């Protein structure tokens, strides 16, 4: 019966494609059309094909020829489609007497449809025709060929034969089964007693096996309890490790933030320190340049002084001559009056008039010379103003160049800071990636341990079930042995049929028990193997956990090292702050020390100028009115603030120059003289006044020297000194140095007053506490840089 049921299942796949109008024979060399229908059970594909196979094919490769199945147009899934293929005649087989059939093959190589067999035969003479009545009792005659009729009969007989053969085979199978059952039951009857003995022996063995299984079960329970406890411990360890990793990560993030802040502060402090150093160097250079320019200007002013002194001496000489001539004229007028009173001689009057005319011509010539000299003096002043303006423009250009240089330095610093920031970002990214990797590994280990724990629980349940089943089987086996004895006693009086039925009932429990024992033993073996595998995996996981703990310890050590590095950088930053504070203090002290000599010089200038004017005014008998304002410095103090700085960046404005005080005119010719001099104090610094010059100012000589006598007689309000020279003065010890003294040696002398640390070369001001300085030096030896208590 099974063969009849399997046939439609096997042929069901071949009905997905149905071939229509298949003839029994075709001509060998003629074109052949193949009509087929695609059912909803198949989905067409462009790589599907239809082949001509010999009957008896085994695989899809046994085709004779094939054509690709075209994809139907406007195809809708779940619908039936009719298709046509045309095979060319020269691809078809010859008349060989073999049977062929069409087969539809998918792109996967599956055959989903097959046609009825057919042959390729050449045309033959007209066969004999036969007439036969219709089977439907319709009183109609059907004309067929003899061969067709014979084929129909053969097909019917073949079908009947196949059905009969199938029935015979089924009956033979049934008889064979019945005979086998009879023989088996007879054999079972003969061997039943022997089996009872064997079962009793097996029962004893099973009792021993159950005891051993109980012992093994207890051992497995102990192992399971140990494994569960270890799993709990491992889970707790994993939780603690994860908490520690999270804490370390938070600490690492906070340390990174602190490190970034410290680096940022350090960079800011370094930038400030560099800018202050650059400003200090610029100020030094500016001071050197100003000193050089001052020396040049002093030399130029000295030359101008000499020129002015010569011109003024000539002017005073001419003024004295004019005064003498006026006195002579007055005397002559008096004489003329007296002479006119005494004598009225015309000749004398003509002579006197002619002398008067000559004297007036001389006076006019002297006036013209005075005007010419005044013009020359004004030209010299204009040239000096132009040189000052050129100097101012040069200084402005120099400042522009300095600003450009500062901008370039700032850009370089910014680029360096960006590079450092990129390096720190990459390092932080790598550390974060490593921490994430550690987290993933810990999570995977925790999941693996959970799975192992669940498997252990499952195995424990299976062991409990097996122990319960073994106990139940023992009880059932004892009951069945008693029933077996009763059945054996009753089977003697029964017929063979009933005995056969009882035999069928009795041996089934024993076979089931034996099978169950075998299954239980196999399960126990499998469980032991699984437990061994689990223990191995557990040991491996334990080893992995130890490795992860070691890695965590390594990362903790690295974090500790990072903390130490960060602390060292913080110490360095604090040292930099201290150095910067000390540099600022030193800068302020230098500023004060440089301002104090400037104030002293200004006080000396203010104290000297009134004395000079006083001496000149006392000699003439009248008091001069002087302004109390301080003189405007030509280049200003570079270390002073912008508001209190004298002068505007070295610019020299002629309109702001303090003019000399106006004297009471001694005669009318002085109003026409054009003379402008700056109100700068060209006297020497404190303590450098020449004693001979002061004596000459106090003691007026009695010799009738016309130029000098006229200068001291009228007083111009200037204290010119041709022997003036600039000296260098130490701002700390006030030691004087000649003007041509080397600048580097002068700076070395000034720096020698400072206290220098022999370890770090850090400078301290001269008034710095000696104990604090010694404590700073000792900090380099006890490895505590920040110990300034």
Swiss-Prot record:
Residues 144-599 form a coiled coil. One of its GO terms (cellular component) is extracellular exosome. Residues 320-420 are annotated as: Oligomerization. Its main location: cytoplasm. Residues 481-502 have a biased composition (Polar residues). Phosphorylated in the C-terminal region by CHUK/IKKA leading to NF-kappa-B signaling down-regulation. Expressed in all tissues tested. A zinc finger (UBZ1-type) spans 727-753, 754-780. Zn(2+) 2 binds at residues 757, 760, 776, 780. Gene3D superfamilies: 2.60.40.2840, 6.20.250.40. CDD domains: Zn-C2H2_TAX1BP1_rpt1, Zn-C2H2_TAX1BP1_rpt2. One of its GO terms (biological process) is negative regulation of canonical NF-kappaB signal transduction. InterPro entries: CALCOCO1-like, CALCOCO1/2_Zn_UBZ1, SKICH, UBA_autophagy_assoc_protein. The modification Phosphoserine is found at residues 124, 138, 225, 593, 609, 666. Zn(2+) 1 binds at residues 730, 733, 749, 753. Residues 481-508, 639-660, 678-712 are annotated as: Disordered. PANTHER family: SKICH DOMAIN-CONTAINING PROTEIN, TAX1-BINDING PROTEIN 1. Ubiquitin-binding adapter that participates in inflammatory, antiviral and innate immune processes as well as selective autophagy regulation. Plays a key role in the negative regulation of NF-kappa-B and IRF3 signalings by acting as an adapter for the ubiquitin-editing enzyme A20/TNFAIP3 to bind and inactivate its substrates. Disrupts the interactions between the E3 ubiquitin ligase TRAF3 and TBK1/IKBKE to attenuate 'Lys63'-linked polyubiquitination of TBK1 and thereby IFN-beta production. Homooligomer. Interacts with TNFAIP3. Interacts with STARD13. Interacts with MYO6. Interacts with TOM1; the interaction is indirect and is mediated by MYO6, which acts as a bridge between TOM1 and TAX1BP1. Interacts with MAVS; this interaction induces MAVS polyubiquitination. Interacts with TNIP1. Interacts with TRAF6; this interaction mediates deubiquitination of TRAF6 and inhibition of NF-kappa-B activation. Interacts with RIPK1; this interaction negatively regulates RIPK1 ubiquitination. Interacts with NBR1. Interacts with TBK1. Interacts with RB1CC1. Interacts with SQSTM1. (Microbial infection) Interacts with the HTLV-1 protein Tax. This is Tax1-binding protein 1. It comes from Homo sapiens. The gene is TAX1BP1.
